[in-house]
Amino acid sequence: MQKLIILLLVAAVLMSTQALFQEKRPMKKIDFLSKGKTDAEKQQKRSCSDDWQYCESPTDCCSWDCDVVCSG
């Protein structure tokens, strides 16, 4: 009976450590992907034509002026 309890405890520890490692892996991927260019650097490469372009934030516009559509 004691051997069974020890075996179950070891299995529980192994499963919990595996779960911890799996939680940390996506965070590393996110950190790797987020170390890209800044918004300003990304905008320099795309064509800056804000004519009637829908936006959600100022970073979506070349003019950095967003009010449902880019203006400026």
UniProtKB/Swiss-Prot annotation:
It is found in: Secreted. The modification 4-hydroxyproline is found at P58. The modification 4-carboxyglutamate is found at E56. Transmembrane segments: none annotated. Residues 20-44 form a propeptide. GO terms for cellular component: extracellular region. Brominated at one of the Trp residues. The keyword RNA-binding does not apply. InterPro entries: Conotoxin. GO terms for molecular function: ion channel inhibitor activity; toxin activity. Disulfide bonds join C48-C62, C55-C66, C61-C70. It comes from the Eukaryota. Residues 1-19 form the signal peptide. The modification Serine amide is found at S71. Keywords: Amidation, Bromination, Cleavage on pair of basic residues, Disulfide bond, Gamma-carboxyglutamic acid, Hydroxylation, Knottin, Neurotoxin, Secreted, Signal, Toxin. Expressed by the venom duct. The presence of a 'disulfide through disulfide knot' structurally defines this protein as a knottin. The cysteine framework is VI/VII (C-C-CC-C-C). Belongs to the conotoxin O2 superfamily. This is Conotoxin Gla(2)-TxVI/A.
